Amino acid sequence: VSLDASTVTLVRYALLDPRVLILRAEEEVDAFAVLTERFVLLLDTMSTPALAEAALDCLRPHLRQRPLLVLNTHADYDHAYGNRVFSAGGRHPTAIIGHRTAAARLTSQGERERLERRQRENARYADVRLVAPTVLVDDALTLDGGDLTLEVRRAPGHTDDHLAVWIPQLRMLLAGDAAEYPFPQAGGTAGLRGLESTLTMLAALDPDVVLACHGGTTSASLLTSNLAYFAQVRAKARAAFTAGGLPNSEVETVFAFEDALRLVGTDSKRVAAFYRSFHEGNVRAALRDLAAG
């Protein structure tokens, strides 16, 4: 994604509770802020320190002397590469909440190598430094904001370190990348199983509003739409496997990309091109799962 280094817009929807703010980095990612009586929670720090600083500038008028907390939904670059702004020596040092596995990812040699590769390929990542969460979550964490309760829940599948936030007073789910329009990316075969379980768990909360980091939707129907998509991925993979298909089968012959988009009410002219690779990965994960027995 190519975007200005500090382009973050505060997005408002008329029916969205004013205590929840959407911070949009053009078409790359949405972060969110929850304004409680006791603190403000920033959900994700985007893909660069410059974007995190721009998000902080959007938030500053809303802090009103309340402490700021930060939460990483997971350690992917577009959700955690701005953490430096909130670390010791950064512009606004504060606690960063994340899953224990996210901390391990952000301190790993593999993640350092991925960042170095990004920095060689794109100057926008030059100022990124890997900063791990400082408050670690294993399964769940409750943040009591006074007027709002923020229930941090483990939500694996897209990645193993993924967290989502449920706000019961608003019947609102901050889904991160666990739900996505048109559909999320499962992290391999184990991730596919995990994501199906996570979506089922999140749908059982019966939210009125679902905010995801990609797709720009607020509709609670996103969860059932994602579940219907994965059910069809499973059905198509099963039919192909029964007919002799192998994990390396041509995905278009198993479940065509346009057919998948039509199922969720869109087409390739209205979604980013990378969703094709998401879909191919999801179908291959289902085929591998069947091959493994």
Task: Mark where each language-model region is.
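A post-motif C-terminal structural segment
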Residues: 215, 226-257
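Active-site HxH/HxHxD metal-binding segment of metal-dependent hydrolases
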Residues: 57-136, 142
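Conserved beta-strand hairpin/beta-sheet module of binuclear metal-dependent hydrolase folds
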Residues: 9-61, 164-177
